Each structure stands twice: as C-alpha cells, then as structure tokens.
Amino acid sequence: MTTIMKTSGIWVCLLLALPQFSEGQQYLNAGEVDVAIVRNPFMASESILAEGLVDSLTALGATIGKNETFSLTEEEEAYSGWAREALVSRHIADLISANGRNEYLTVALLGSCSDLPGVLSGLQNMGPGQEEQVYHLAANIPNRVGLIYFDAHADVNTPETTLSGMYGGMDVALAAGLYNDNNRLITGLDPPLPPSYILLADVRDTDPREVELIERMQFEIISTDDIRTQSENVHAQMKRLSELTDVIYIHIDMDVLAPEEVSGHGLTAPDGPTSQELADCLELIFQYPKAAAIGIASTPYGPRDPDHLSRQAAVRLVQGALRGVNKRT
C-alpha cells in the first residue's frame, strides 16, 4: 500500500470519527440550554449583566454554566492600540476554547467589534465535548467557523481602503486574512476564514474602496428586508453555512439597529431593524443546530443610554437567540 493510500485511509477514519449531531443535541441537558457567558471586562458588558441578562435567560429555561471574564497581565497592560486589541482577543479566545463544542451556547459580551477575532479563534479551537467520541488526532483539526456579521458597516476595510482608519472597521478583513496576519495569529485564529464562510447582514454604510473589496471577495449578503421578513434568503444562507461549516458565530454590532434604540452609539445608520425585528430573526437563525454563539458589541451604556433602551435591546437579542435554541427538536 502506498504512503498516499495509507494517509488517505487515516483521514477517512478521522472524518468518520467526527460526531454527526442530531438537531437537538447541542447545549441541551434535560430539556435546558446550558449557556456560557464570556465577557470583555468593559463597562458595556457589565451594564448588560446589570440589565438582568442572567435572570432573563434563566426565565427562558437556560442554565448559566459559566460566567467568566479576564484581566490583562501587567506586561500586556503596557501595550496600546492594535497590539492591545489582539491581546484582549486572545484572552476571549482562551475562555471560549476551554469549552467543549457541544456543551454550551456561548454568549459573548464584547467591548467593540475589535473583539471579533477572539470569538472566532475560540470557536475554531474549541475541543470535542464530553459526549463526542473522536480519535485523539482528530481533536486537533480546527473547527470550520461560519460568521454572520450584523453591522451597519461591513468592516471589510484594510489600511489601503479605509477612510476613517478605525481598527474596528477592519475586523472582518482581518478575520478573512486580508491584512495584519500578525495580529490574527496572536489571537489564535489560524487559518483565516474563507470568504464563503462569511455572511454580511444589514450593511448600510460602506467606504467606496471597501465596496470594491466586498465585490471582489464575493461576500454573501442579507438585507434589512430579509431580516424583517425572515425571508427565504435567510433560510438559504443558514442552510449554505450549515453545510460548509462546523459552527456558526452570530456577531452583532448594536449600530445595526434602528438609531432610535442606539442613539448613543455614534456610528448609527438610518433604516435599521428594531431590536424586536432582529430578535425574531435570531430566533429563526438559532433554530439551526450549527448556530453556536452570539456576540453583542458596542452597546451604549451610562449617560449614552439614559433610558436603558440600548441595554434592554441587547438583552432582547440574546433572548431571541435562546428562544431559537429552545425550538430545536
């Protein structure tokens, strides 16, 4: 037998050993959904907790298995700018990857969209869960992670295309391997996400050269109307990503919402969905078993959210995701 044939046989065995999930298997324990909350130690994250997130999820039948945050080391605290963002993402990745792939619904309470690579890295490097039976070699194969990116901005800019120069406007490009491989590797995201694994949702404000990049990379898109009507396009995209990937991360920048609910954001764009409309769409999305995590970023709080509308909206979105998981059979 040739070396190639032997190697092929090994990989066939490994692939056959990987688990085939039933639609109701993930995160369900005696009829309850096990949730792991991961927090950037930023006031926006803490303010969402203070808005009653935990109680609202337990009222929907969830068990909060973990509720964790992290601190930068003294050495890491010396860094600023892009380097610091990468280190923060690495800590987020470490918290998420410590969980088994089928053990928890991950709820990531993030500072800004710069935390995106950390969540993706954590899901990519998440090991097999306790119920999975795999050969030890297969456990080292990175998970294929899909991304649904709800944001009024595509965040597909690179330093060559951006008008603003904002690092937080480049995180999808970084995740796709379009620039700054050093920061991506610091976060542990390796390999980068292929463009076919990425779905841009409700993008309404882009830079001209960013649009050229989106078109060249052929990113898939769903519109505001798709979200409001829960159109067939949403189903088609979920089926497509479910076939391509092992787990799907749903990322939400709160500026995706109607400006009336996030007036303190600073980067709002007109004609966004209400939080209830998006929560209803998330309920549909999370009925698909590959939907493994939801992340909430850039939530206005304190004086920028005097009536608590933004924080209540954030809680509403996570509730929508949990309702979807509850509908899995």
Task: Tell me what each language-model feature is.
Residues S22-G24:
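Signal peptide processing junction and immediate N-terminal pro/mature segment
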Residues M1-M5:
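N-terminal secretory signal peptides that target proteins for export/translocation
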